[in-house]
Amino acid sequence: MSRRIIVGTLQRTQRNMNSGISQVFQRELTCPICMNYFIDPVTIDCGHSFCRPCFYLNWQDIPILTQCFECIKTIQQRNLKTNIRLKKMASLARKASLWLFLSSEEQMCGIHRETKKMFCEVDRSLLCLLCSSSQEHRYHRHCPAEWAAEEHWEKLLKKMQSLWEKACENQRNLNVETTRISHWKAFGDILYRSESVLLHMPQPLNLALRAGPITGLRDRLNQF
């Protein structure tokens, strides 16, 4: 076997290995609920990780005890802390995925044939460096594309956190109203039973009737 064939075979094997490692790496950084790279990941008691917003927003009744989405083990939903290392790795993976997307032929600047690295905050569009300094965009605000992407995810996280807080508040209000209605219903049942008992109790004899004469009773007794 020639040296060229051996080298080619080794290169293909290396590419396949890298591809396999990349897929495993990507899978480990993907939330099993939203199937995207983690946003503010939290690791629960059983060891599995989820995006914090995904974890919170998938419980309608907001129980204290619940089950893991993957292993179905009962877990505590308290004091969830961000997995900092996993968050950083997911952020790097998002940036790498973004650069892979921007480097594709479809996303190259049609005028200058350069990668669109800049984001125009006015036009909300991706531009290459030359386009961002052109007359049309010169006075617009620009930032690197990865900054814009991370800012987008942070805003999304805040919105989802706000939704979760509102859901918690609504659930608390609902619990208060449910308890109040239950108490009023119990009070109404007590009143109903009390009224029923009073209606079936024997009524006392009217003293005025018992003290008065019964007309004709003596005459009837004398007939015997």
From Swiss-Prot:
Q: What is its EC number?
A: 2.3.2.27
Q: Where are the zinc fingers (B box-type)?
A: 104-145
Q: Which reaction does it catalyse?
A: S-ubiquitinyl-[E2 ubiquitin-conjugating enzyme]-L-cysteine + [acceptor protein]-L-lysine = [E2 ubiquitin-conjugating enzyme]-L-cysteine + N(6)-ubiquitinyl-[acceptor protein]-L-lysine
Q: Which residues of this UniProt protein bind Zn(2+)?
A: C109, H112, C131, H137
| PROSITE patterns, alphabetized | ZF_BBOX (PS50119), ZF_RING_2 (PS50089)
Q: Does the keyword Methyltransferase apply?
A: no
Question: Subunit structure of this entry?
Answer: Interacts with PRMT1; the interaction leads to ubiquitination of PRMT1 by TRIM48. Interacts with MAP3K5. Interacts with STRAP.
PANTHER family xref list:
E3 UBIQUITIN-PROTEIN LIGASE TRIM
What name goes with this protein? Answer: E3 ubiquitin-protein ligase TRIM48
Q: What is the lineage of its organism?
A: Eukaryota, Metazoa, Chordata, Craniata, Vertebrata
